Curated annotation (Swiss-Prot):
Residues 1-11 have a biased composition (Basic and acidic residues). Keywords: Metal-binding, mRNA processing, mRNA splicing, Nucleus, Repeat, RNA-binding, Spliceosome, Zinc, Zinc-finger. This is Branchpoint-bridging protein. Residues 139-205 form the KH domain. It comes from Candida glabrata (strain ATCC 2001 / BCRC 20586 / JCM 3761 / NBRC 0622 / NRRL Y-65 / CBS 138) (Yeast). SUPFAM superfamilies: Eukaryotic type KH-domain (KH-domain type I) (SSF54791), Retrovirus zinc finger-like domains (SSF57756). The gene is BBP. Residues 1-22, 324-391, 431-465 are annotated as: Disordered. The lineage of its organism: Eukaryota, Fungi, Dikarya, Ascomycota, Saccharomycotina. Necessary for the splicing of pre-mRNA. Has a role in the recognition of the branch site (5'-UACUAAC-3'), the pyrimidine tract and the 3'-splice site at the 3'-end of introns.
Length: 465
């Protein structure tokens, strides 16, 4: 019954015809094959041996493609067949023979590229046509790391990262597979092949040579590795993409702007270590350092020495807070003088008490010479003829110690009662004796040195009365 049904359906003749064609191809294959010698008698170097093996395999593949004798491996040795794919006319384009032929052609292309580099001047087989495009798939580990947005990292802000990868590698990179298309997109909005969700998420890399394919795979792998290995929040690639996106949207807040307080970069104004606080405005009057008062000062320097730099009064030995005592004229308006007022301040320079009645923190030494000296003011006689007498009207004598005044040897004309000599009147000076030195020195004409008369007259030149 089964043989009869096969004859009715016409399958018996088809199977016989198929077997006849296979036998014919086998006989033709033996004639077409130009077998290269497999036994090499002469010595060859390692490079020559490698080149010969490549040439042998290229010739073998060319003969198989030319004879159309594609021997599909057994079911145990071949991979599972992919789902069938049909073209616009309804013909299947991914049969086992077609897939095997495509595999052989790719192998021959790689071998021709290697041999052309090893052997200069090598000519490929006549039926060989170099493919214009190559493509490869790089699968992304979405199932292992579902929390990472690989598509966003590969695309970048408005596709800038993907375009940069394509420019650097020289190939075309497209994201395909499940999860590569946003919801709401249709096939009319996307390029052909983008709606194919049969494969998992992957990068489709297309180029004109193998080197560019490898560069594209390496670029995609680097981004995936960086996204997987970087801790959360420390991915520099993602930070750069967010910054570029803010620049494109016009919402970027520049982080490299200098601080308004110190003018340096790297921190905000509220994080500035040099910002002025309330404590920085307080200046210690002892050490002139900001941040504390005199009570909290830990400086070992002398208070009396540091107080001279006070901005209130550099001459006061203590810190004075009241300014009313510096204005004695304020009391004169009311016609009275306060008690213990000496004209400049209600406290003497040698006072041991401050304004608040407390004793001085640092005692000041008293003047040692104040009790042992006498202050004496001398009013010299005025004279309108001498400049020296005019200057002495404003001169006051310093203190002279009583115990040492007797031991001093005063010059002539100076006594203890009148320490400053009287002014000299040069009009009263008389010449008693004018004599020349011993020797033969002669006086000028008209001058007689031997005459001791005080009425000496000088004679002028001849002709002058």
């Amino acid at each position: 019954m089964s043989e009869r049904r096969e004859e009715e359906r016409g399958r018996t003749g088809f199977s016989m015809k198929k077997n006849h064609n296979s036998n014919f191809n086998r006989r033709n294959q033996e004639q077409i094959h130009q077998k290269l010698p497999t036994k090499i008698s002469g010595p060859l170097t390692l490079e020559q041996l490698c080149a010969y093996q490549h040439m042998f395999r290229i010739q073998e593949i060319s003969s198989i493609i030319k004879s159309h004798s594609f021997e599909v491996p057994n079911a145990r040795n071949r991979s599972p067949s992919p789902p069938p794919v049909y073209d616009a006319e309804g013909k299947r384009i991914n049969t086992r023979e077609q897939l095997y032929k495509k595999k052989l052609m790719n192998e021959r292309f790689k071998l021709v590229e290697v041999v052309s580099k090893l052997i200069p001047g090598y000519s490929a087989p006549k039926d060989y046509k170099r493919p214009t495009t190559f493509q490869e798939k790089y699968y992304i580990p979405v199932s292992q790391y579902p929390q990472i947005n690989f598509v966003g990292l590969l695309l970048g802000p408005r596709g800038k990262t993907l375009r940069k990868m394509q420019e650097d590698s020289g190939c075309k990179i497209a994201i395909r597979g499940r999860g590569s298309v946003k919801e709401g997109k249709t096939s009319s909005d996307l390029p052909p092949g983008a709606m194919d969700f049969s494969d998992p998420l992957h990068c489709l890399i297309i180029a004109d040579n193998e080197e560019k394919i490898e560069n594209g795979i390496k670029a995609c792998r680097n981004i995936v590795i960086k996204a997987v290995t970087s801790p959360e929040g420390q991915n520099e690639l993602k930070r750069g993409q967010l910054r570029e996106l803010a620049e494109l949207n016009g919402t970027l807040r520049e982080d490299n702007r200098p601080c308004a307080t110190c003018g340096q970069q790297g921190h905000k104004k509220y994080e500035c270590p040099h910002r002025e606080t309330f404590a920085m405005k307080i200046i210690c009057r002892r050490c002139n350092q900001p941040g504390h008062t005199i009570r909290d000062c830990t400086s070992d320097s002398n208070y009396g020495k540091q107080i001279h730099s006070s901005r209130y009064n550099n001459e006061m030995p203590y810190h004075r807070t009241s300014t009313a005592v510096d204005q004695p004229s304020a009391y004169s308006r009311y016609g009275y003088t306060p008690r213990n007022h000496n004209g400049s301040s209600r406290f003497n320079d040698n006072s041991k008490y401050l304004n608040n009645g407390n004793k001085r923190a640092t005692p000041q030494p008293e003047l040692e010479l104040e009790t042992s000296h006498k202050r004496q003011q001398i009013n010299p006689t005025s004279s309108s003829q001498d400049t020296l007498s005019h200057q002495t009207n404003h001169m006051t004598m310093t203190t002279i110690e009583d115990s040492g005044i007797d031991k001093l040897q005063l010059p002539a004309g100076m006594s203890n009662e009148n320490p400053i000599p009287q002014p000299v009147n040069f009009n009263e000076i008389q010449i008693n004796d004018v004599s020349g030195p011993n020797g033969t020195l002669e006086a000028p004409p008209g001058l007689d040195l031997g005459n001791n008369d005080s009425n000496i007259t000088l004679q002028g030149p001849p002709g002058l009365n």
